[in-house]
Amino acid sequence: MAQPSIGQKIVVDVPSTTANLGPGFDCLGAALDLNNRFAMRRIEGDSGRFELIIEGNEGSHLRGGPNNLIYRAAQRVWKAAGLEPVGLEAKVRLAVPPARGLGSSASAIVAGLVGANALVGEPLSKEKLLELAIDIEGHPDNVVPSLLGGLCLTAKAASQRWRVVRCVWINSVKVVVAIPSIRLSTSEARRAMPKDIPISDAVENLGALTLLLQGLRTGNGDLITDGMHDRLHEPYRWPLIKGGLDVRDAALNAGAWGCAISGAGPSVLALCPEDKGQAVSQAMVKAWEAEGVASRAPLLSIQTGGSHWQPQIEDE
């Protein structure tokens, strides 16, 4: 695509993501068909100028300025391409609020990278954008599926190079994500975890991960059930989520194959067959309602296309 001129807008669509999927702590994540939209354009003026416009109530507390995560990511693109930074405006419509465990920071990073790259003629490859995204976020399990889409397993090889494996997620396995009104910051969730874990817990997680990946590939519910167990972070984070265990149990009783904390929480994810989706959704919302917590629980599929941009024809 041709490089947009100053004032011309592009639209970047970035999927929400779920990470730490089951036993895949800090390595396994998936893109959900719940997109965040970023309308972006170059603006005249100071190269450090960043204007942020939030549409709707989600993320209304976010602010612009040069320290905003979108703009910081954009600056990394321009630096890597050997270009001078430019002023930027972003009009943002979030599908889910921040601090819910659905990759809001990853969405901001990927939007900044993809949008900034597009606005200067796409000098960087998707592989380079992926490298920058992981470096900015500090871990790969949200930013990789946010950029690439699908189910992604990411690990650092002995060579210190990040390796990404696109795994198969059969379409018959659906996702219900119960998104509560309460917040939980990633930093708070990280602090709850111990610095060291028993080797038996690590071994159990490795085995569960292989079962889960096979279950998602084949649609085998029994394998998903046996694989959706974690010993590395969930035992320490469930107590931080008001009513979280009740929500999990309600989903399982309604027919879900397995449940997990989405990301660092507080959202709770359930995997189920499509014909159980509505029952699982209603049960999870009702369980949180019993704790005085408002929530919604959409039935979702995996988004396979990842992030993409296009010229904006008219204001939306």
UniProtKB/Swiss-Prot annotation:
GO biological process: threonine biosynthetic process
Role played: Catalyzes the ATP-dependent phosphorylation of L-homoserine to L-homoserine phosphate.
GO terms assigned for molecular function: ATP binding; homoserine kinase activity
InterPro entries tied to this protein: GHMP_kinase_C_dom, GHMP_kinase_C_sf, GHMP_kinase_N_dom, GHMP_knse_ATP-bd_CS, Homoserine_kinase, Ribosomal_Su5_D2-typ_SF, Ribsml_uS5_D2-typ_fold_subgr
SUPFAM superfamilies: GHMP Kinase, C-terminal domain (SSF55060), Ribosomal protein S5 domain 2-like (SSF54211)
Top-level taxonomic group: Bacteria
Protein name: Homoserine kinase
Record-listed ATP binding positions: 97-107
Location(s), subcellular: Cytoplasm
Coiled coil: none
Cross-referenced PANTHER family: HOMOSERINE KINASE, HOMOSERINE/4-DIPHOSPHOCYTIDYL-2-C-METHYL-D-ERYTHRITOL KINASE
Record field: catalytic activity: L-homoserine + ATP = O-phospho-L-homoserine + ADP + H(+)
E.C. number(s) listed in UniProt: 2.7.1.39
UniProt pathway annotation: Amino-acid biosynthesis; L-threonine biosynthesis; L-threonine from L-aspartate: step 4/5
Annotated signal sequence range: none
Record-stated family: Belongs to the GHMP kinase family. Homoserine kinase subfamily.
One Gene Ontology CC term in the entry: cytoplasm
The keyword Transferase is annotated on this UniProt entry: yes
Assigned keywords, A-Z: Amino-acid biosynthesis, ATP-binding, Cytoplasm, Kinase, Nucleotide-binding, Threonine biosynthesis, Transferase
